[in-house]
Amino acid sequence: MLKITRRKFLGSALAAGLCSRSSFAQQEKLRIGVTDWNLHLGANPEALPMAANLGFEGVQISFGRTLVDGEMPADNPEVIARYLALSRQYKIPIDGTCVDKLHDNGLKSDPLAAKWVLDSIRLTRALDTKVLLLPFFGRWALQTKQEMDYAGDALRDLAVEATKAGVILGLEDTISAEDNVRIMERSQSSSVLVYYDVGNSTVAGFDPVKEIRWLGKSRICQFHLKDNPHYLGEGSIQFLPIMRAIRDIQFSGYANLEADAPSKQLEADMRRNLAFIRNVMAQS
């Protein structure tokens, strides 16, 4: 695999910024967004102006984990109205959502998880967006066939409501592409897709390039791009082959940066990571 060095990146950044016709431009546009939690503004509408000022093309918002009157923090008409107003004002889309409450009540076995997913489907529709990320991590990570089957069965019922709302349920986890497809098939719904995280897959020992090409655009709803705790391009993940694979499957939509800020200078680090990935896209 070809690796982009930082020297090469810095030397070509200006040219990439001026480039108006990359290979990605020949297909429907891949847009680069950012997660609100990596802006340290989880479940906070102020993530939208910050992301816009940093140059991102969308924001993936989380609904929050610390309940307010028994509901997720974003489950409030005034909060939803604020999100929509800021999205219009700063001309930046809400590109997707995340039911991060599943970190507390996981869908692999906790009956309470269904409530948070159903509420999040409703909120996702209210925010006029389509992709709802369902995380399976920590003690809620999928590890056994029984757990995967339980998740698939739970998704079968939840997907009915997602389909009615025009919402896609995106599975983000640490299992293989093949196991994710088995869950999708068990759900019996085209509204259940893979939310592909290149960092999680690499750490779990899978080959992102191979998996992205095998899954194809029809089974992936969005991407997370990261190589934490490093800057993009300075860790072990080689992004040029990954971005070429995304291009080659003709994926269009959003890839959200879920990248850390290694220097703790949040805005500078976010700009640096965004510039890097756009440079890679220009070379793809």
Give names to the regions the model predicted.
Residues S62-R82, G138-Q143:
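Glycine-rich, proline-tolerant flexible connector loops at the mouths of alpha/beta enzymes
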Residues L30-T35, V59-I61, I94-V99, L132-L134, ...:
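Hydrophobic faces of well-ordered beta-strands that scaffold small-molecule active sites
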Residues A74-I80, D110-L118, E147-L155, D207-R213, ...:
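Charged helix-capping and loop-helix junction motifs
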Residues V34-T35, V68-E71, D104-K108, T144-Q146, ...:
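Short, contiguous strand/loop micro-motifs
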Residues L67-A74, K91-V99, K130-P135, I168-E172, ...:
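Low-complexity, flexible helical/coil segments
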Residues L14-L18, E46-L48, A52, L86-G96, ...:
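Active-site acidic/histidine proton-transfer and metal-coordination neighborhood
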Residues N38, F63-R65, D100-H103, F136-W140, ...:
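Active-site-proximal loop/turn and secondary-structure-junction residues that shape catalytic pockets
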Residues L2-C19, F24-R31, H40-L54, A177-S284:
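Histidine-acidic metal/acid-base catalytic patches
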